[in-house]
Amino acid sequence: MYPFFAMLSRMKYINRWGLMRNTRSENICEHSLETALIAHALATIGNEKFGKHYDAERAAALAMFHDTSEIITGDMPTPVKYHSEEIRNAYAEVEEMAVEHLVSMLPEELRQSYRALMTMGGEQDGELKTLVKAADKISAVIKCVEERRSGNHDFRKAEQTITQSIADMHLPEADYFMKEFLPSYGLTLEEQDYTREAGLKFAESSQMVFSKVLK
């Protein structure tokens, strides 16, 4: 019996933003999925817009596993994690130990594949690691936007700081996402969904489909 995937399912119990007042809690499971979606988007943007040759599916997979060590370590607040080089190094060592502990819960023949996912240690993962890092930051900005929209001003400074850190990466894929996609996260469902004309067109099309089924 191997409990690896059962342990991964516990990601939904690990909440992020422990030092912040949240109007809605966010766990590392949902954060990992959002980061994976964004990492895939950044890779696709790079390929289609900037002539890169990223493996978008690999980027998404790396992002899905990027916080798995926190099942063991918990989510350490960023100000604490990066307070000093000594703490950063110590935490990195603990993360490595956590990964090895999780990997030990797999059959021997699967361990290297999942270790590479969890550490981004594959042969082609170097450039993708940067995309995942950017996607991780963008996901954090999205959380800040959502909290601000809910009237919670505790995330205002975090939003400014993380947004600047993304700009400082000088990553065209991330800059493109921030310009073209991020603003819609501040809209209501009605504003996000469709223009009135497009919405009516969809409604008409869906009615036609259902009418055929019901005949």
For each predicted feature, which ranges?
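Alpha-helical, largely C-terminal catalytic domains
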Residues: M1-K215
